[in-house]
Amino acid sequence: MTIEFSTQNVAERMTPGYSMDEETREICLAYVEKALRLAEKRYAEISAIEGPDDRELSPMYASIRNQLIYLRRVITGEEKDIYRIDTFTMGIYAIREFEDSDPLFADRIHSASYIADQIRLSKKKIHLPNDPEKNPDYWAQQAELKAKYPEEYDL
């Protein structure tokens, strides 16, 4: 079996087909930064709790943190190769692990994952997580999260 390698395909992947104006870039970065700050806090908390023989959760939190750092680099333009976005698992973690136990963290990961999906799909226009057409209940959900988690909401 012969696999043909096309440098054009690689070049297309290295230059995303989406465009992001400066305002959208800043908003996307704000979503990712909020998720990253909370991920770093959760990672530190879990690492402090887990003993040396009990390291089951730390890798998951580290993975989420690394994916968010990579996404930030893609949004800022520091990272041109968007191929790794195809391998992101943080959205799955948000649903399976955090939706019930840590809704604020799940929300932050969902927002960052949504932005990553927009980039991965090479959308010509990036829709933000608070887009009223895509998520009409966004602001009500945010008000509920802020009421439940006032000390971490603006982290």
Which role fits each region the language model picked out?
Residues 20, 24-27, 31, 56, ...:
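Non-membrane alpha-helical secondary structure
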Residues 41-97:
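Amphipathic alpha-helical interaction modules
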Residues 2-59, 142-144, 149-152:
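Short terminal alpha-helical segments
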Residues 87-155:
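Amphipathic alpha-helical binding modules
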Residues 23, 27-41, 63, 67-70, ...:
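Charged, amphipathic alpha-helical oligomerization/scaffolding segments
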Residues 9, 31-34, 66, 130, ...:
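Detector for Asparagine
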